[in-house]
A protein has these predicted regions:
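Hydrophobic beta-strand anchors of alpha/beta hydrolase catalytic cores
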Residues: 514-518, 545, 675
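The conserved beta1-alpha1 loop
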Residues: 519-521, 679
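Active-site-proximal cap/loop segments of hydrolase catalytic domains
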Residues: 534, 541, 547-746
Length: 746
């Protein structure tokens, strides 16, 4: 339905892009009130535990934590003649009794430790106040209706609302908060029919990627009988007559493999409204390439079904098509080789407009005749520019092109012949997230925010090129007291890398500022500025928030991405280490005051640099990280990450992966800084076994007395759709941990 910025995703609690398919806890035991004797026994156990915790609250204490004993085996794997032990293999089975026991004990240790640290409740209250602002996102027009997300402030999940005019009174179309009291059911996808009368929506439970789709009548607010199951990351694309839609799905997995089953053999189906899913028509499959994923797309007013085929390398894909109006039409290839990226923009007649990196690492726009797709017939509409093209749409006979300029947003309106263009003035240094538009629309919508810029929704008049605010969030803090600036630093090999720094104005450069350094660095995903309540809270605590746009992302096009993948992955770690060294050298902070954080692929980053430079950081927080680089491809969407990382099945890749794999490079006897690892029990994107094995190994290897803790969230997944209450609790725990580890003031 829309493009949503990282900040908006977090604020709305509905979206997450990290390590997704490329179309890219508080544990019950720690808060449960049991009855009678069971409650007394539980309370007694916790009191004894907390008494012990009090002995080692100081990160520099001479007392080492007494960690739970993890279930251990004698598993040894042979990789091309190299023996590699995997003693904690059993922790990959989240449902095993031994794993559940160890997870419970680890959570008791972690939550007991955190509960005794001073300041947690004050931090939680401040986070709650900061999170409590009205949020909007994803404005889109279909038929006579405008659809958009709305969150009144602290709702666990954002609500889908609909209105007939921008000034009219909206009504609730979908409220996922009514699905479960704990807020763990989330909207993970949506698609309005062409006439706007029907609305397909996907719901995932407990943070899982598995999604069920239903169809709602917009006028009545009632669901039709249709139910689509066993989709992961699939979009829904309506047929030209709105009589059904195309979608992709996997086979139903055995119940015991819901968390770990590899995402293989995705197929495209057509669902006719009113039919049971079992009657859906198979449209396309590739059994010869079981790891490929396929997304169907019917462009507005087009007779063609397009198939976006992802073969495993981010930023590269195939394209196929089928003529839906021709009898007995067969699928044919448009782009038969996945050497570059090709993203459909629109179809006019038989002309397909594409955004591509073919012949343009930073992106260009071309047009091709679907009936005659030979390269000789291609026409360049908009050539490559100095900025990176990261999105394109067509409406009102114009192209809206979204660019990145040094990792923040810019935009242009360009004529269809590419001869005239005008800049769209952005409100500042931040991220513009554009919603979808229809070909005849005279308007487009975009959200804009930055690290120190509150979110707003803008309406762009396509005839005048002027923008106006239609929804504005009012946050509970004066943002004028904070500032964001961009600096550039040299990495180990001399590469110039950008970094955003956000803090209170008038920062004193004395090396004593608590600093939280974040990066992602992979999968052709850019880190652009976005408003996040947790970042404002960190600044309120006197901290500096540093976001490094290291290689591996899309900030400077495909070359920037390729410089941080596969055999060049060490560049990512070098860039991050260089960012830390720059912050120290320029007196923003010092090692005892420097914390690092990353999630998903960024969690891998934190684990890797922690092994390579444990002396450089004062604290570390790897979240839902890919920690076992030798086995990641065996679980969930891991098969689709082979193009980015390589695979241990390949001898050359194995050497590269083993050299930096966080799990396999933990140094026994090293002194690691205070570390808080986080994962979730329902994460089926990066299965929790990655973090569980990593934590067990790191705890046993730690020579120093600094705590190595793991926090395992319950009824949560990789991050998409995580309830507001869980997000606030999680960040309160992280910040009180950092407050203690970095010896921050009250």
């Amino acid at each position: 339905m829309c493009y949503v910025s990282a900040g908006a995703r977090e604020g709305l609690g509905s979206f997450d892009s990290e390590l997704a398919r490329y179309v890219p806890k508080r544990p019950a035991v720690s808060r449960r009130l049991c009855d009678n004797g069971a409650e007394r026994l539980f309370v007694k156990t916790i009191l004894l535990l907390l008494a012990g915790v009090a002995l080692f609250l100081d990160a520099g204490s001479v007392t080492k934590l007494n960690y739970p004993v993890a279930p251990k085996g004698d598993q040894v794997d042979d990789y091309h003649g190299v023996k590699v032990a995997d003693p904690y293999r059993g922790l990959e089975n989240a449902d095993a009794t031994a794993t559940e026991k160890w997870v419970t004990e680890e959570n008791e240790l972690t939550f007991g430790y955190l509960a005794k640290l001073p300041g947690r409740e004050a931090i939680k209250k401040q986070l709650t106040d900061l999170w409590n602002y009205e949020k909007f996102g994803g404005f889109e027009k279909a038929g006579n209706h405008y659809f958009y997300f709305h969150n009144s402030g602290l709702q666990n999940q954002s609500v889908m609302e609909v209105t007939d005019s921008l000034t009219g009174t909206p009504r609730v179309l979908l409220d996922p908060n009514t699905y479960r009291k704990d807020g763990t059911a989330a909207l993970t996808g949506d698609s309005a029919s062409w006439n706007g009368k029907l609305f397909a929506y996907g719901v995932a439970q407990a943070g899982s990627d598995w999604t069920e789709w239903r169809v709602r009548d917009v006028a009545t607010g009632k669901d039709l009988s249709d139910l689509i199951q066993w989709t992961k990351g699939s979009n829904v694309s309506w047929a030209e007559d709105d009589g059904g839609f195309y979608y992709s799905r996997f086979q139903q997995p055995p119940p015991e493999q819901m968390l770990t089953v590899a995402a293989l053999n995705e197929k495209v189906y057509f669902h006719k409204l009113g039919d049971p899913q079992a009657a859906d028509k198979l449209i396309y499959e590739r059994p010869d390439h079981p790891n490929w994923t396929i997304d169907p797309l019917v462009m507005e007013g087009s007779r063609y079904l397009l198939l976006y085929i992802y073969t495993g390398v981010p930023g590269k894909n195939l394209l196929a098509y089928q003529d839906l109006r021709a009898a007995n039409s067969k699928t044919a290839m448009l782009i038969p080789s996945a050497d570059f990226g090709y993203t459909p923009i629109a179809v006019v007649g038989s002309t397909l407009y594409l955004e591509t990196t073919d012949g343009a690492p930073r992106g260009r726009v071309i047009a091709m005749d679907i009936e005659h797709p030979e390269r000789a017939n291609w026409k360049e509409i908009v050539p490559e520019r100095g900025e990176t093209l990261d999105g394109a749409q067509m409406a009102d006979g114009k192209l809206l092109l979204s660019y990145m300029k040094d990792a923040h947003s810019a935009a242009k309106l360009v004529s269809l012949d590419g001869k005239t263009s005008e800049d769209i003035v952005m409100p500042g240094i931040g991220t513009a997230a554009w919603s979808g538009a229809r070909l005849q629309d005279k308007e487009m919508f975009y959200g804009f925010d930055g690290f120190t810029i509150a979110p707003s929704i803008y309406r762009l008049d396509l005839e005048t090129g002027k923008s106006a605010v239609i929804r504005q969030s009012k946050v509970a803090v004066d943002l004028s007291q904070y500032e964001t600036k961009q600096v550039f630093y040299a990495s180990k090999d001399g590469t110039r890398v950008p970094m955003f720094l956000s803090s209170k104005k008038g920062l004193k450069l004395d090396g004593q500022n608590p600093t939280l350094l974040y990066a992602y660095g992979g999968f052709d995903v850019a880190d652009t500025p976005g408003f996040r309540p947790r970042i404002v809270e960190w600044m309120q605590m006197g901290g500096v928030y540093a976001s490094a746009d290291i290689r591996g992302g899309s900030e400077y096009g495909e070359a920037w991405h390729q410089a941080g993948m596969r055999a060049k992955k060490q560049n990512v770690f070098d860039d991050f280490i260089a960012a830390a060294e720059w912050l120290i050298a320029n007196k923003y902070t010092s090692t005892p005051k420097l914390a690092i954080y990353g999630a998903s692929n960024g969690g891998l980053l934190i684990g890797a640099v922690l092994n390579q430079r444990p002396d450089l950081f004062g604290a570390a927080m790897p979240a839902v990280g890919v920690m076992d680089m030798l086995r990641f491809q065996n679980f969930g969407f891991g098969t689709q990450w082979v193009g980015e990382y390589g695979t241990s099945a390949n001898p050359e890749d194995f050497k590269v992966l083993r050299a930096y794999s966080p799990l396999h490079n933990i140094r026994r006897g090293a002194q690691y800084p205070p570390t808080l690892i986080t994962t979730s029990d329902h994460d089926d994107r990066v299965m929790p076994g990655h973090s569980l094995k990593y934590a067990a190994t790191l705890q046993q290897a730690q020579e120093g007395t600094a705590p190595i803790l793991i926090r395992i969230e319950t009824r949560a997944g990789h991050g998409a759709g995580k309830p507001t209450t869980k997000q606030i609790d999680e960040w309160a725990d992280r910040y009180v941990f950092l407050k203690n580890a970095l010896k921050m003031g009250s």
